[in-house]
């Protein structure tokens, strides 16, 4: 049973998947930092100093100054957080699109490679076979 598990776990696809998940998690953290620490502050500066992480609509209770206070008081729609996550998603989707596009281009190049010429001996043997077939006919 241990041998079967070892064969299953060490198959190429399983290891590739595990590596992909680990790299994907690290990439997600990197994109999250880029969005939160670089892109959103620039967008905030362009839009007049708006802090998107604190943008919300309070649905119940008295108006609150911060998102945390509004959530404690009742229902809120945190659309600033949604905008941040949407930008995060779009960046990840764009990078994945580029990766898939690059992989497809590499596959097409591999498929487009011409078949190697048959060895000269094989060509001669084919010609001899064809001549013998004509003589019999």
Swiss-Prot record:
Keywords: Cell inner membrane, Cell membrane, Ion channel, Ion transport, Membrane, Transmembrane, Transmembrane helix, Transport
Membrane spanning stretches: 15-35, 38-58, 80-100
Cellular location(s): Cell inner membrane
UniProt membrane topology term: Multi-pass membrane protein
Signal peptide interval: none
Main location (coarse class): membrane
GO molecular function: mechanosensitive monoatomic ion channel activity
Cited PROSITE patterns: MSCL
An annotated GO cellular component: plasma membrane
Keyword Cell inner membrane listed: yes
Family, similarity comment: Belongs to the MscL family.
Record note on quaternary structure: Homopentamer.
Purpose: Channel that opens in response to stretch forces in the membrane lipid bilayer. May participate in the regulation of osmotic pressure changes within the cell.
Protein name: Large-conductance mechanosensitive channel
Taxonomic source organism: Brucella anthropi (strain ATCC 49188 / DSM 6882 / CCUG 24695 / JCM 21032 / LMG 3331 / NBRC 15819 / NCTC 12168 / Alc 37)
